[in-house]
Amino acid sequence: MSETFSDVEEMSILQSTKKKIGPTADYDAFDHDILVSINSTFATLFDVCGFGGDKPVRINGPEETWDTIITDPRLEWIKDYVFMKVKIAFDPPSNATLLENYNKQITELEWRIYTVLNDYYPDVH
């Protein structure tokens, strides 16, 4: 039995991010660029919110899964945060209003993630 894309989305950080920004799961020409953007986003989350513990989360390919880095359902916003940051870095909207909207959502998500980490994981900071 083969995996459906929704199965991959639930598991793979790279594949679910690719789905959100456009390329299909089997198209891998931009995987390296997308990985760089994902890892940069995790580094930002580490710097801004303390997410990742002692060091930023880093992925190397489609094997890394969301459930290995997000163990608390209150942190599910991290997925949306990664998708939006990668979208802006990889394929930014040409419409200034849309870009501003993305940036406002990103700022709100940073605050929400920081708040959860600060309230429930104070030793992280």
Residue ranges and their predicted role:
Residues 1-74, 111-125:
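Conserved short "hinge" loops at termini or chain/domain junctions
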Residues 13-20, 84, 88-117:
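Short, compact, well-ordered microdomains
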Residues 39-46, 83, 87, 91:
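Amphipathic alpha-helical core segments of compact helical bundles
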Residues 43, 58, 73, 82, ...:
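Alpha-helical protein-protein interaction elements
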Residues 69-87:
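Amphipathic protein-protein interaction modules
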